[in-house]
Amino acid sequence: IFGFVMVIGSLLKVPESLTVTNRESSSGLKTMFKNFKILLKTPRFVLPMLIQGMTFVILFTYISASPFIIQKIYGMTAIQFSWMFAGIGITLIISSQLTGYLVDFIDSQKLMRGMTMIQIIGVILVTIVLLNHWNFWILAIGFIILIAPVTGVATLGFTIAMDESSSGRGSSSRLLGLVQFLFGGVASPLV
């Protein structure tokens, strides 16, 4: 009910933020798919979009698999898992805030490259830990290295990709959202 009231309220009270002069002359599915085609031919848009999509694969597979890994393989209770999950969730907030601070001093593409490399290190570490059944604390550190950069990569990927789209910004935003959740949604049941 609350969601329905919010939708109605936003339709009635929130004004359109895009000025009439900046709106596209034609809209609809045909225009959206035409814009998708143009965007998918732009490597400087596609690369951040794919990196962002893979980051959501990491996030969604972590969310799907970690309860089973921690509770079934490592024998922890649901409460212990909840504390670990919350702690790693806090690293997402820290990463988001840190990204907002660092973007003033470091080029966003370099920052995204660095955060992506951190995630790759996390993937390698978590894989090695799980294959060798190493200590839980090493796994937790691996999860932190793997998951903490998600908010930074997602934000930077979106910003970098949107900077490359000169027209059809709505289509750009839709495509970015589609890819990240499509990749994540497809990966979740596979783990």
Walk through the language-model features, giving the residues of each.
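Pair of pore-lining "gating" transmembrane helices in MFS-fold secondary transporters
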Residues: 41-61, 144-148
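Small-residue hotspots at the loop-to-helix junctions and early N-terminal turns
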Residues: 78-86, 173-174
